[in-house]
Every structure is written in C-alpha cells, then in structure tokens.
A protein has these predicted regions:
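Alpha-helical multipass membrane-protein architecture
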Residues: 1-618
C-alpha cells in the first residue's frame, strides 16, 4: 500500500473542510478568551464531539476521518494561544500601533508550521517508544472510539455521565458562579511567612491526574510544594513588604518564584533532548522502506524544504528590524534552535499533563530571556532589540503550542491506528487557516476593547496577562530588574533533580523524579498541581494500571470533554457581552468553596469505584 493509500478514508475533502472551518472558529474564540482571561480552551475533544455529529449526519463516516477533523481544528486553538500570549506585547510597548496583517500572518504562520515540522522526528521517541500518558490524547481517542461503538453501550453511558458531570461543574463554577473555582487559604507564622494551601475544583484536572497516574502527578506536586512551601515562605520571611495571606503568596510566586520553573525548564529541556538523542537519530536515519506505509511521517525532503522556506522571510524581517545582515541571520538561527528545543519540551510536557495545562508561557519566557540577552550584548539597549526578542518569542511560543498539541493528536491517532502523515498534513491545514483570521480578529478586539491596562479611554480593556509578562521580561533585560538569581536557581534545582533521579534509577526505585515534571510543578500554581495529584492518588489506590482503557479512563475522558465543551459555550456570551459575570447568579453568600469540594470528592469516589470494579472483574 502506498503512503497516499494509507491516508485514504482519513484525509478526505469533507474532513479537511470541516477541520479548517472549526480551526478558524476556535482560533477566533480563543483569541478573545486568552486576551480576556489569560487562558485558552483545549479544542481536540470539543472538535471530536462536533465532528462526530456532523460527519455521522453526512453518512459513511469513520473514526479516522473524525480524528483528522479534530487534529486540524485543535491547531487553530493552539495557534491562538501562541499568538495572544506574545504579539500584543508589541502593541502595549508601542512598537506596533495595530496588528499589521502581513507581519502577524508571517510570524504566526512560521511559528505554527515550525511546531509541526520540529515535532515530526519526535513522534516515535515520545509516542511509540515512551511511557508518556498524553492524557488528552487518550481522552480524545476514547471519545472517538465510544462514538463509534468501540466502548459498548455501558462504556458510552459512563463517558456520557462523565461529560454531563464535567459540564455541569464548569457551568456552576465559571458560569453561574455558584462556587469558587478554587478552595484556598493560607497559614501565616510569627515571622510573617505564609504557606499557601489550596486546590482547583476542576473535574478535568482530577481526570488528568487519574490518567497520568501517581508516578507523574507526585513529582509535579513535589516541585509545587518546594516552590510554595519552601521558597515563597523564605522570601516572605526576609522581606519587610511582602505582606501575608493568599494574595501575598501569589504575588511573590508571580514576581519571583515561578522563574525557578523557567530555569528548570531550560535545563530540563536540554537534558530531555539529550536523553532522546538515540530515538531522534533513528528517526532521521529511517527510510521509507523500513517503515510501514500506515506509520510514515512526512518525508525528510519535505521537512527540510519547508524549514528553509520558512526561515528565509523571518531572517529578512530580523535584518530589517536590526539593520544588520549578520545580526538578522544569527537571530533567525537562534529562533530555529529555540523552536526545536522548546517544541520538544512542550511535546514532552503535553505527555505529562496534557496540552491544556502545558506551560507554554514558561518556555516562551526562557526564549525571550536568551534572545534579549544576546541582542543586548551585541546591539545595546534599543527598542528594536526588545521587539526582536518578542518576535522570536512569538515564533517559538506558536511552535511550542502547536508542538504540544500535535503530539497529543498523534497519541490519539496512534491509539486509533491513524496515519501520522495524514495528521501532520491536517495540522498544517489548521495552522494555515487560522493565521489568516487572527490578525483581523486581534485588530477588531484592540479597537473595540483595547488591549493592556485599563484606562479612561479603554475602561473594558482586555488585560492580556501573558503578553504583559513577556513585555516586562523583554524590557527588563534592556532596562534591568529581572530576577536572574531565581532563573539560575531553577537551573541548579534541575541539575539536583537529575542527580536524584539517577540515584533512584540505580536503586531500582518505583518512584522516579523526571526533571521536567518537577520543573512543571515549580512553574504552575500549587492549586493546579494539587488537583492533578489528587487524581494521581485516586488512580494509585484504585489499582489502575498504566495503559489500561477501562471504564475509569472513559469516565475521566468524559470529565475532560464536558468541562472543555462547557468552557467554550460559556465563552460565547462572555465574548458577546464583554462581561465575565454575564451568567452569574446574584445571590447572597455566593460563591462558596464547599460545594465544589464535595463534588470533587464524589467524582474521585466514582473513579475509584469504576476502577475497582474493572480490576475485580479481571
């Protein structure tokens, strides 16, 4: 069977058209949501559910065709995240008066396509030859299989029950504001050190922890506990103006401690690539004759050609920005190297916690730091240097966002028996479709609401929190004030974690300390790490075994599906009205925390019961 024959019934015209349409819609919706709230909604599972309904109504659909639709559609959402986390910084710093169409399309398109290209040689290393869970990939595959009867009537009922529970919880929490999104408090000692205690009340995070298991959830929690129970209290103890309480701990984390995670991600990413060197060389060295047609990736000749074609216009842009041919070429090479490094890091971390919880902003900060320092050393403190660093960061952020999403989709495809080449083409289609609508959408939002801090002219301005952080990092290098000590400290912690993991490996310990999992814990809010850890504990005590796809996995997939779908539905009236509380019930005493805690406990118990019953049946 030829390579094209392996794609028959998958990359159909109607699948491509539907995938492109969903990519455009979801990229526009997530552009607003990301600027407004600082987060985006994962599109793989919602797109899978939508495509199930549309393609089955058209007739003669199959699960692999649906998989192509969600692959293309999810690219739009991921690209939107890369764009809105970075490019608004150029507007806020005054370098761009608006979002110029050609430059926005070029930066986003190059970054998104690089994300696909850079992760092609990683597929076998991370998906085929790795124990990484890719929780959203598993959940997407479970949804699609259930939709075509692969789970049976009972399994489909479990999936639907989880989806209803996840959707209602999201509606009550984020829409109606019946309870708080997180249960949190703090304990303050006599020396003014505050210890944060809390957890997100998110069924989807509980499900992610259940899917990845305790061996990944625990190192993430350990990283979080180090940041929030050791580093932050120490900073507060020796600072006279840090304050106390939950808000104070979060302020210290935002300004200083999360840079530990940035440094750790940088070192951990390089270490992870070194560990994957054998698989990478094997991927580059394989030939078409050594791989089954159904398992072939895009050819190396195509990847290399695309790489050159994408690099040339970016090099020209950097030459124009810096007014230096040598400088522009060097920055373009740095961009390519950083795109490969951090696409790999994002792909690896998507395997740990899923693309929804992937800290793409962390790898973007690391990129902007490295680029800005180099530009400052060679070109001095000029605004063009800060802008160039932001643009490099934007390309890498788009590449990392697409890289993590691409690997998640390829995991789903691996479970379903899909053609990797067909999925990689679908990802590129989704990227190309989304780039042409993001520039006008961003310009529309800029003129309608404003982007950046609220002022008299823009009382409803969209805060764009990640882009504000990127601007602060880039300008901080040229103007001073960045917490370099914390970045370096994070790198040293990564080296220590690598050493500890080596000791555990030599002793044959069942507990390991993967450095990127610990780095993730250092960077993320502790409330997120705790919610994932709870799911990991449920998985461990219920006897769930990695790789098994029983009713517990279907329930977890349902929880993720319901929350993701409801997140998009809630975003529609919020976007239309410009009010985050448009659905909130104005009732005295709301929101509360305890109803969400009771719900989380009940869902944890449900996952435990389902898994125990499956375990007992075997």
């Amino acid at each position: 069977m030829s390579g094209s024959g392996a794609m028959e019934g998958q990359l159909t015209l109607r699948a491509a058209v539907l995938g492109v349409a969903l990519a455009v819609l979801l990229s526009a919706a997530n552009a607003y949501l990301g600027l407004f709230a600082g987060l985006t909604v994962s599109a793989s599972i919602p797109a899978a559910v939508i495509s199930l309904g549309v393609l089955r109504a058209l007739g003669n659909a199959n699960v692999l065709e649906n998989n192509i639709v969600q692959t293309a559609a999810s690219a739009g959402e991921s690209l939107a995240a890369g764009v809105i986390f970075t490019l608004p910084a150029l507007v806020m710093m005054g370098y761009w008066p608006d979002f110029p169409y050609f430059q926005t399309v070029l930066i986003a398109g190059v970054g998104g396509l690089l994300g696909v290209i850079m992760t092609v040689p990683l597929r076998r290393a991370l998906v085929d030859d790795s124990p990484l869970a890719f929780p959203e990939g598993q959940a997407t595959a479970a949804v699609l299989k259930a939709g075509y009867g692969g789970a049976g009537a009972a399994g489909l009922g479990v999936l639907a029950g989880g989806a209803v529970a996840g959707a209602l919880a999201k509606l009550a929490d984020s829409g109606l504001k019946l309870w708080q999104g997180a249960a949190e408090t703090s304990v303050t000692l006599a020396n003014q050190s505050s210890f944060y205690i809390g957890s997100y009340l998110s069924p989807a995070l509980l499900a992610v922890g259940y899917i990845v298991g305790i061996n990944i959830a625990l190192p993430i929690l350990i990283g979080g506990l180090f940041a929030w129970w050791i580093a932050i209290p120490l900073v507060m103890a020796f600072s006279s103006d840090a304050g106390t309480g939950v808000a104070a701990t979060q302020a210290v984390w935002s300004a200083q401690i999360r840079y530990l995670g940035v440094g750790a991600m940088l070192v951990g990413g390089l270490y992870a690539l070194w560990g994957l060197r054998g698989s990478l060389f094997g991927a580059f060295g394989s030939t078409a004759e050594t791989v089954l047609p159904s398992q072939r990736d895009l050819p190396r000749s195509v990847l290399i050609t695309l790489l050159v074609v994408l690099a040339i216009p970016m090099a020209v842009l950097y030459v124009w920005l810096l007014d230096s041919i040598v400088g522009g070429v060097i920055v373009a090479l740095v961009m390519l190297a950083a795109a490969f490094l951090f696409s790999a890091v994002a792909a690896y971390m998507a395997g740990l916690v899923g693309s929804s919880n992937n800290p793409v902003s962390g790898v973007t900060i690391a990129t902007i730091l490295m680029t800005a320092v180099g530009l400052w050393l060679f070109f001095g403190a000029e605004q063009a240097g800060a802008a160039s660093a932001i643009i490099v960061g934007a390309v890498v952020c788009c590449a990392a966002a697409i890289g993590g999403d691409n690997m998640q989709d390829l995991k789903a495809g691996s479970i379903l028996g899909a053609s990797p080449r067909a999925q990689q083409i679908a990802q590129m289609l989704g990227v190309v479709a989304a780039v042409f609508v993001l520039a006008p959408v961003l310009s529309l939002l800029l003129h309608a609401y404003g982007i950046g801090p609220v002022d008299a002219a823009h009382p409803n301005s969209l805060p764009a929190p990640q882009a504000s952080l990127m601007m602060a990092v880039a300008q901080g290098v040229f103007e001073g004030g960045l917490p370099w000590d914390w970045v370096i400290g994070g790198g040293l912690l990564a080296f220590a974690t690598i050493g500890l993991d080596g000791v555990l490996a030599r002793r044959g310990s069942g507990l390991r300390m993967p450095v990127l999992a610990v780095a993730l814990g250092l960077y993320l809010p502790l409330s997120l790490s705790v919610a994932i850890a709870v799911g990991g504990v449920v998985s461990a005590v219920s006897g769930a075994k990695p790789g098994e796809h029983g009713r517990g996995l279907l329930a977890a997939a349902g929880l993720i599906t319901g929350e993701a779908l409801m997140g998009i539905l809630i975003a529609l009236p919020v976007a239309a009205s410009g009010r985050p509380d448009v659905l909130a019930l104005d009732l005295a005493g709301l929101p509360l925390a305890w109803p969400g805690m009771v719900l989380m406990a009940g869902l944890a118990g449900w996952l435990w019961i389902l898994t125990r019953r499956d375990t007992s049946a075997h």
